[in-house]
């Protein structure tokens, strides 16, 4: 049975109920679940003060569980980046720990990649996903398969026009606002020739465009093999838009960057999300409108898992839509 620790490294958990529900569901999925002692701490909008949250991260790293799953994102990891013991986290990855999350966890994933090249996992958050009332089938199934080493690829549908695309590169990215906040810091991994995956929430398309243009003008976008856009959810239209939306943002970006920009990736602040490795060489193939994103089993998982036989679950996500 794979050990799994739930910890809260950023925003405060307002209620304990979602944490209990998440622990129950994850146990049913077959994980040996433990909850970090400080998971429900409160300090202002954070899950405890900076020292407490930093120690929680280090405590999880020293425990070296099979899975380190954050309860939620919010805001708070940026405060800790200059103080995290990156080599301690990297040693936990080497020992087999899969660090999983998205949203504010992008800071941890980017920092770990920048400082140590250790891979992590883009995936659900315990309370936001496993702790909500209604849980879809794709999210837990994909997560469980990824955490046990059975998952080697995911699939989704994109727009027409990319048939025949076949490229390889380091899978990286995350929350767009978080990425922009890390540009120019020591916690920015200088990835060239990568597959850059992006998502965000509650950002109007003009703000999304401004952040994408920042990455473009910093030379980040043009140096990638492909850009894969997940969900940009929960934004409100303005009467000033006059037809301006996310589609026009993508069209404008495509006019500037000679790199394939794919949409439709099932990830971000949405109910259904896949789990994929971060900081691992990926293989992106498009057939018609079907996108298959695979990765090297040996590099995505620790040496403890190399004896397991991986399966190709391409199409895992889009068959459910």
Label each region the model flagged.
Residues 67-83, 102:
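N-terminal glycine-rich "phosphate-gripper" loop used for MgATP/nucleotide binding
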Residues 190-246:
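Internal helical hairpin/lid segments
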Residues 231-301:
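ATP/nucleoside-binding phosphotransfer catalytic cores, i.e., glycine-rich phosphate-binding loops
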Residues 299-321:
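Histidine-centered metal-binding segments
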Residues 72-75, 203, 233, 267:
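Short glycine-rich anion-binding loops that position phosphate/pyrophosphate groups of nucleotides
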Residues 117-180, 184:
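Conserved anion/nucleotide-ligand pocket segment
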Residues 1-64:
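ATP/NTP phosphate-donor binding region
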Residues 86-111, 119-125, 260:
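Short, acidic/small-residue loops that bind anionic groups at enzyme active sites
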């Amino acid at each position: 049975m794979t050990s799994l620790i739930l910890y809260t490294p950023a925003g405060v958990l307002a209620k304990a109920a979602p944490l209990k529900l998440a622990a129950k569901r994850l146990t049913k999925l077959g994980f040996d679940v433990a909850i970090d002692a400080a998971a429900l701490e409160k300090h202002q909008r954070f899950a405890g003060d900076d020292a407490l949250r930093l120690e929680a991260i280090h405590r999880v790293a020293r425990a070296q569980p099979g899975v380190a799953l954050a309860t939620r994102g919010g805001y708070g990891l940026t405060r800790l980046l200059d103080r995290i013991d990156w080599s301690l986290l990297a040693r936990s990855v080497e020992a087999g720990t899969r660090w999983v999350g998205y949203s504010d966890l992008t800071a941890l994933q980017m920092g770990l990649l920048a400082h140590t090249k250790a891979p992590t996992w883009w995936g659900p958050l315990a309370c936001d996903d496993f702790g909500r009332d209604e849980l879809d089938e794709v999210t837990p199934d994909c997560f469980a398969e990824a955490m046990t080493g059975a998952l080697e690829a995911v699939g989704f549908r994109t727009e027409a026009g990319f048939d025949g695309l076949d490229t390889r590169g380091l899978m990286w990215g995350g929350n767009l606002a978080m990425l922009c906040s890390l540009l120019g810091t020591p916690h920015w991994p200088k990835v060239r020739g990568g597959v850059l995956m992006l998502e965000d929430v509650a950002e109007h398309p003009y703000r999304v465009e401004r952040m994408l243009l920042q990455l473009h003008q910093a030379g980040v976008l043009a140096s990638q093999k492909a850009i894969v856009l997940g969900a940009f959810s929960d934004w409100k239209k303005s009467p000033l838009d006059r037809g301006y939306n996310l589609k026009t943002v993508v069209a404008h970006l495509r006019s500037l960057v000679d790199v394939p920009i794919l949409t439709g990736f099932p990830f971000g602040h949405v109910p259904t999300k896949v789990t994929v490795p971060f900081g691992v060489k990926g293989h992106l193939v498009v057939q018609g409108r079907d996108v298959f994103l695979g990765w090297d089993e040996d590099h995505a998982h620790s040496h403890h898992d190399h004896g397991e036989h991986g399966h190709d679950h391409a199409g895992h996500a889009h068959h459910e839509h």
